[in-house]
Amino acid sequence: MRPYELMVIIDPEVEERTVEPSLQKFLNVITNDGGTIEKVDIWGRRRLAYDIKKKSEGIYAVVNFTAKPETAKELDRQLSLNETIMRTKITRPEEQKVVAE
C-alpha cells in the first residue's frame, strides 16, 4: 500500500453540494480494495489557469488516500470516463526527509 494524492477538477455546472456524494462513488473503489481514505478536501469553485472544455472555472477537490498501485490506476480510469470530471491528477507525495545535524 502506498500513499497517494488525487486532485480532481469537476465541471462548474455541477451543484457544489452534490460534489462530495458523487466523489464518494468513485472513492469506493479504494475502500473495496482494502485501501483507506485519509482526507477529502473540497476547495470549491476556482478560476482555471486556462480554459478546459471551454470553461474558465472548475470545482477543485483534493483526496489523500492509501492504496495499491493497481487501485490508483483503476480509480483514475473510472474518473476519466465520467463527463463531469474535467481533469484528474494522481501523485505520490514526497517522503519527509530527515536531515541529520
Swiss-Prot record:
Naming one, the record's GO cellular component terms include: ribonucleoprotein complex
Q: Which UniProt keywords apply?
A: Ribonucleoprotein, Ribosomal protein, RNA-binding, rRNA-binding
What's a GO biological-process term for it?
translation
**One GO MF term:** structural constituent of ribosome
Give the matching Pfam families: Ribosomal_S6
Family recorded in the similarity comment: Belongs to the bacterial ribosomal protein bS6 family.
NCBIfam families referenced in this protein's UniProt entry, alphabetically: S6
What the protein does?
Binds together with bS18 to 16S ribosomal RNA.
Q: What is this protein called?
A: Small ribosomal subunit protein bS6
- Lineage of origin: Bacteria, Bacillati, Actinomycetota, Actinomycetes, Micrococcales
